Amino acid sequence: MQERIDAYFDTLARLTRGAEATDRGGKPLALARGFEIVRDAAHAAHDGGNKIMFVGNGGSAGIASHLAIDFSKNGILRSMAFNDAAALTCLGNDLGYDNVFAAQLEFHARTGDVLIAISSSGRSRNILAAVEVARNKDCRVATFSGFGEDNELRRMGDVNFYIRSREYGFVEVAHLALCHAILDLDMGWGAKKIEAKRAMVELDG
């Protein structure tokens, strides 16, 4: 059993560290550059009186809600998710489930906002529709996907993060870890340790 546990967490770590970032044209980006694009877009939105919006289904919806409160409370960045039960059931009933997020973006999105679109498969119609609305409203878009490398969502963001796995658990946890890393590193996680190491190297030199 321990070998399987070790293999599980080794795989999760490998997939997260191996996350692939690309631009809208499919050009590979360094992961650090991908993080910078999201960070800069988030700060530009906040400074301009705009907001960050998160969308996802199922486990990805949980991630969206989790991140919206963390980006708001810890990052001091205006953020929201669209997972209210009344809104989802109303819009799903009236407009169809493919439109539950797109309709809310029509209500709330403004030029200069940022959309974080999360889908393990990268093929969820309601997520793709939400991105289309965000694009039409001149929002910045970051996507998080997995499963097939040719999924549609991966080609729709200003920056696109992809986890090379077809296992829901691995993809979802990696997506959450990446988003947390973007926020936590922006807030200075590890900076003091790095500065201390540099100081030690300079002293030794």
At which residue positions do the language-model features occur?
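Conserved N-terminal alpha-helical segment that immediately precedes and caps sugar-phosphate-binding
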Residues: 1-205
